[in-house]
Amino acid sequence: MTSSRAVVSLFDIEKGVNDTMSISQQTGELVSYETGAAAILRSQGLPASDDYALTSSPLRFDDGGHYRIEISGVERLSTLEALLDESAKRNVHVHRIVAFGGGATLLDRGELTAFADLARESKIQVIAVPGPRTGWDTGRQALSSEGTTAGRRVRGVDNMRFLIDDYLRIFECGFRGVLVWDEGILNVLNTARTAGDIPEDAVFKVSVYTGYANPAGIKLLEGLGADSVNPVGDLGRPMLAAIRSSVQIPLDVWAMTFESFGGMNRLWEAGDIARVAAPVYFKVEPGESEGVMYNAWIEPEFHEKLVRHKVRHSAILNELVTSTQKSVGVSPTPTRVS
């Protein structure tokens, strides 16, 4: 009788995995010949292990692309202008930007509207960051050394209202994409989108600060209305492949991370990450720390210089994907964005 499982060695999989385990030829799962937990996970449509077979994702963006480029920290109009100039020089299209890391509240309506108009003309989707909110209100837990582990949840109803008004101001200035880091707020926004209380084409990107790192959690966010999710930045390819097997929405994966958040550089892995986790937004965000990069008083020239580095690194990512995974393609420049 031929077994449906192919036994593999420790070297073949990952350090520390017991050699009595095996990889399923059908699913790529690593399992210990059934456990109660494995049965429970499968019964709920979840994988029973990370995908050590690194199964290719069957999903793509609607234009056929495996991945798109996302650059964070586009703080004001002059930063966007520098990004566009460098993109033209390096022949790389930036599909999406995360804007106003220091908080959209700190830009006036004229600045916000001009930014939205230029991004739309340039076929770039914007994810606008509201605030500053959590960590800048009167609550101190979120800033304490151990309180940071609780995440950036919104404290109380007043802060919920302030935040939602911030989102409404962003929508009124012409943006459609927003960053969300509280599951309750995500549910409120999704309900409002369904009810027509906010634009029906609003886009919700769930922040890495929610701390999700497995298929069950990201499937939950998808059900709450997330349009893409940024899982924690240090997930291996088997973990990302397992997440992809459970959800349909794009994953936002850091290709370069700022130093205070780990400083990971995954440029050489990008092609294979896109192969197993497509559709993927590759986030390019080198730098020192949020505290240095995203505050309201830093000089505009700092961001203009830094964003040029981010575009250069994005061009290198495209080059390395092409050289390492010839079957993986980047999305073309879109004809329009919301």
Specify the residue positions occupied by each region the protein language model found.
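Short, glycine/polar-rich helix-capping loops at beta-to-alpha or helix-loop-helix junctions
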Residues: 213-217
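Active-site pocket-lining/capping segments in soluble small-molecule metabolic enzymes
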Residues: 7-175, 180-212, 230, 237-338
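Hydrophobic, aromatic-enriched interface-forming segments
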Residues: 224-227
